[in-house]
Amino acid sequence: MRKRTLIVLGILLASFVIQSCSSSPERGIISRYFNAVRMNDNATMASMALEPAQWDVASWDIVSVSPEKIEPMTLPGLTKAEADAKKAQDGQIGPTMDADTVLQNAKDEQDLARSAGAKAVAKKKVDEAQAKYDTEYAKMKEFKTNYTNAKAAASAEEQIALFSLGLRELASIRDLSGNVHSKDVVVNIKTTQGQVKSYRLPMRMYELKNDAGQKLPARWIIVKFEPVV
């Protein structure tokens, strides 16, 4: 087990060194990945792809490589969007509960109404309170959905960044600055059964700096394998 761990760590270290010296790392990375697939080396596959996949591969080839993009790290912005969405959701709790209280009180009054006139007035109050509650509840659902989506987006980006850095966790990851390199690679995979399958491989590398301004070791990684229809 210790030997297997040392081998995986060696592969990770080698990938850092090789990728830093190569402007077109995708062929080497993908070649090493498919070698691991053929050897059924799950540990190596899991060290190279955030969402690894496996087939009975006879051969493979690269169909296309998109131009490399270099963009600022988005995680700080996604973290702020998550915080803003949570604030909006939490701020809507009070108005929704207040509207519900008014609605329940109106329904109680309606239950106690006896005369036709009192019932008509009570029904109008219930209808108005129901409309108000429906409006506030719809806002609550929207804010909750927005927060759920924002939280998921920030978490997903955090996991990709950590994976590129070769780390399981880093307390300050959401506060780091730097650039994200990305490209899409399309590959054709021929299985041992003769089937040819096409996949798009989003690839990323995060070049980030810590609080002291020092660059953190970065490597290209495969995010996932997306079937090309």
Task: Name what the model sees in each region.
Residues 73-90:
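Alpha-helical linker/edge segments of TPR/alpha-solenoid repeat scaffolds
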Residues 9-16:
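Bacterial N-terminal signal peptides
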